[in-house]
């Protein structure tokens, strides 16, 4: 694996602020044929609530008034025990997190500054109004083709290419990757098309990823987008897009993906809003790919102000009805068993009591994290021209705080965790799935490294039955959620075979 210093020299010589590259430059090494179907491919953020138009974050009382608890950065860091790592200087510095989204956001540099001011996080070189200094983490953008982020693109009547939802996804991904790994660099990778353009939009994502991987621009990549495996015209159409993941494994880049937000079901390739799920259990790709680490989801029932203790008294009901339980499996967390990929070797040995993974199917997800917006993270966004938000005084709002959920909340935060592990390692860890299950196969290590989520289910898509969260691995939260201070150093050891 390439060392951090080598990657850094190449990376920042190539990317300083915002780079625009045409599609033709990244087509080399692409798939042997294009996807030929219209694939419903969308941001995994689907669970959100607008709270306030102020630049000041909302109070817990404001959040509780709409049945939510809203996590700030400190509370989330404490909930997953990151403090001891920060205390030893491990915050992701020297590592770059790649975040892939459609369209990008013209206001991200401004919104990131507001977010960091609100929560006392370190500022990044590349933020609006911030003077760059030695050793500061960098926020930058890599734009594929002509990315137009100011106006709405044509949507062919479907509404699926709306910039507003993607802008919220971008803000969630960037702000919360930084919140968890405040020393890491962040590269936002923008593509000019979205999910309804199956022939163009899908390959654009993976051409962009391949460009980033081949040019050593990121050490870990978060993918907060998904499509049902059956949404492709053929299995071969899906397999033709795996070239970026194969390159990532060869070059030591960790790939993560949200497992989806429709529970144990997935949706067909119909270019309409909110298509009816398939009438059978199904999973979302790329989280179902064995070369990718899939991230499932939970309700997080810790104190949203401090994260230091379980809070069973505040909303939502899932926390109130499970007293003393720190996390409950999220009802909409994507998970189940692949119809494309057989069980990989790394899933042959699971913790005792796990849900059985059949030999014919890869189990999804691998790991879990907070996901429901009922116990969501606070995201600040400016959305010029959006008329869907009404301020308390009745006027139309264009900026403010949301509480946001979805498994796309977990993917960038897990990418941030891996950035910290990369720093501990002295360079990128690369493909981590075998190491995750190596830890899971050792009862003592597993008990120390993971919070095992054993309550809840992902049965949100009736009549498709959901799966329960169980002891060990399950199709809702995978192996569980991370006790970061113990898990990340142990992950480094496991990657090296220890």
Name these PLM-found stretches.
Residues 354, 422-475:
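An often Trp-containing, charged/polar helix-loop segment at the C-terminal end
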Residues 32-294, 338-406, 411, 422-431, ...:
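Substrate-binding/charge-relay-adjacent region of secreted/lumenal peptidase catalytic domains
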Residues 294-340:
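Polar, glycine-rich mid-to-C-terminal structural blocks
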Residues 22-25, 324, 348:
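N-terminal start and proteolytic maturation junction detector
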Residues 2-6, 448-449:
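Membrane-interface anchoring segments and C-terminal beta-barrel signals
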Residues 417:
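Walker A/P-loop NTP-binding active-site region of P-loop NTPases
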Residues 4-34:
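Secretory targeting and sorting signals
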